[in-house]
Amino acid sequence: MGGVRLGDPRLDHFGELMSDTLNRRSFLQYGASAVTIGLTRRVQSVVPPLRNVERGSGGEDDLEETTIAQLQDAMRSGARTAQSICAAYLARIAALDSKLHAVLETNPEALRIAGSLDAERKAGKVRGPLHGIPVLVKDNITTGDRMMTTAGSLALAGNTPPRDAPLVARLRAAGAVILGKTNLSEWANIRSNQSSSGWSARGGQCANPYALDRNPCGSSSGTGAAIAASFAAVGIGTETDGSIVCPSSACSLVGVKPTLGLIEGGGIIPIAHSQDTAGPMARTVADASVLLGALSCHDYSASLDPNGLRGARIGVARKKFFGYSPEADALVETAIDVLKRQGAVIVDPADIPHAGEYDDSELIVLLYELKADLAAYLAQWAPSASVKSLADVIAFNEAHKTTEMPYFGQELFIQAQQKGPLTDQAYRDALAKDQRLSRTEGLDVVFTQQNLDAIVAPTGSPPWPTDLVNGDHFLGASSTPAAVAGYPSVAVPAGYSFGLPVGMSFIGKANSEAMLLKLAYAYEQAAKPRKAPRFLLTADLASA
């Protein structure tokens, strides 16, 4: 693989490279995390200046960890306006994002839009709980404004689509202010199995605000890092397998991977329609519930109950999902004790049949659908782009190797390009296998046999040191069963190991978001697990 090696001047010498290199898991496990706790070299990304950023009028420190309800109270009382809130978040981005590379660009119309929403409020019109609330969205979600939509790729640089994705239109209708676009693993981490999560040619390497040499996971890396750092009230990520829940775990957030189809998927630069979905990323369950409600037109906030764990039957999926990280295991065991103390009935173990048996068929499906779905997206949503197909993107990357492929290649793109149409029997067989083993012979079986309301497991391990030379160091994850089945999962903070976040996932049946959020909220209210990041250079080895 090309790219930098030790001694390259692009490396920042403030630590030792890991002494042991672990085998990297398949890209299908990018809902995973973690490697040994130790110092590493941090690669400094060479990135262009943040587009459109305005410093605003100050007050950014007041916004750290502020919730949607608190912002609404401030606007209702007159202590704040939507415009002053947006200005303060913009100032916070301007002051701190040089450490994270989490935000690709900010919306040049944000302050004007916020001002118009203030005028509505003054006239007695409040659209709902998102009125005047700043939201960051991942850069594979189409916005029909002056911001680009690129999936982090220079192949789509300058692409300003003519209209919003349906989910963005819903946010605007609910009164949200689209504050900016976040960095991501380029092309949502489907280009190479040697990639570094959070790296894109457009944005460089995104860092984790809990320890700047650690990875934020991906592919919704920038949304995770930005919301953890209080660059906006809430954010939107997308997931094919792990891309919401893993960065939520790595950045101590609540991440909701909804049931497939709950949120309209048009206008998202795709990997695969059989698994792709957008979802909320927030610092609290209540905020995630408000955002999911706006995206889906359901009132999930009404389900939140601090006593919601009483009598709930919660299974523990141990096989395949415990044992790869002692730190994650210990923190999740403590979280399970909280569930018990709050009145949940714990069914342990409640293993998921066939977990791990459909990784190969999942990859086949994703590669087939990528080729077809990307061409359809480019035709409908990026008609002025110079690239019209996956083949065009591959050719662009080859012609711009120094900027697009300095660290890793595009072997998954090439494999996808070699696939045939979606009428191929190989694709149909792989899709049928995925759905059978993940749904009817998988999650459906354990939920029915054990009469469960949810299943819990570690989301992943503590964040690993970012390594552009060798790529990500994954040990394990619990994202795949729900991702392949199209069922919901909610990641919540479980605790910290050496100051590094670890999450726990609640996995549910189809369309059980209200139940999962109720359980997650009751856990959160009892455990109070989240701490704000401190932007440390590396892990705090003095803490437990």
Segments the model singles out, each with a brief description of its role:
Residues 10, 28, 95, 173, ...:
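Structural helix-boundary/capping segments
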Residues 132-151, 308-317, 368-439, 493-501:
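Short helix-loop capping/hinge segments that flank enzyme active sites or metal/cofactor-binding pockets
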Residues 86, 115, 165, 326-351, ...:
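Acyltransferase
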